[in-house]
Amino acid sequence: MTWRVVHVSQSEKMRLKLDNLLVQKMGQEFTVPLSDISIIVAEGGDTVVTLRLLSALSKYNIALVVCDNEHLPTGIYHSQNGHFRAYKRLKEQMNWSQKQKDKAWQIVTYYKINNQEDVLAMFEKSLDNIRLLSDYKEQIEPGDRTNREGHASKVYFNELFGKQFVRVTQQEADVINAGLNYGYAIMRAQMARIVAGYGLNGLLGIFHKNEYNQFNLVDDLMEPFRQIVDVWVYDNLRDQEFLKYEYRLGLTDLLNAKIKYGKETCSVTVAMDKYVKGFIKYISEKDSSKFHCPVVSSLEWRK
């Protein structure tokens, strides 16, 4: 499996050279085999990217994350329908019943709140709020009709970052929000790459239904992985003023962090891949035996 996340800052040009990414920067050239790469994060508004490289990125199912002048991810380029049975997958996806989708969302939401509870326990936060999240996850109905996910998130963020904290996605965000937004965007890009690689159409979600969002399914499935970013931001950015380059690199490198998936220890990227595979098996065959999500407290960098 491809594993490398390449972070390119202030380069002049990125192009293809013999199935390698070639980066030209300050009179020097750097090459990375495309077969090793899962994601490229590009910063710097003057970078030129050739069409031949973009075509090769699609062929190798490599996601390209583009950042603005404030270093915030603003776009994702990824392959579409690269799976050898894309039409079969699409037909299956369009035939998912509402009951199947509601049950899948119930499972995903359970994993998300379970990880939020785990994060609060890791940082020895209020036992009352930890118990409240535990109650919320047990109350989740198919389709989360009572919005336990929304209630849990409010309790979670207020407890983790303080009652004055408000989640915002605007560019004027404080360093905590900027870190969360950056990390979530990287996770989203990786999930989009994996979802497309398995022939799933990101437009057709199990819960999200925004007609303007091509990543509805991606946004559904990535929910239990957001807490990996939350832990890193809490550990590293609470006393910082700006989201400096070294912190952006750290957030990007979260995809390579080691975490437990079932009985196996693997990278976050591999865990995401296994998770999507398990989701497909569950929703297609009603077999939940492989549909797991890693628990955040098993992250090895904190041990």
Q: What is each stretch, according to the model?
A:
Residues 2-5, 9-12, 59, 71-303:
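Active-site helix-to-loop segments that bind/position phosphate- or nucleotide-bearing substrates
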Residues 8-51, 55-56:
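N-terminal ordered "arm"
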Residues 35-85:
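Glycine/small-residue-rich interface belts in oligomeric ring/scaffold proteins
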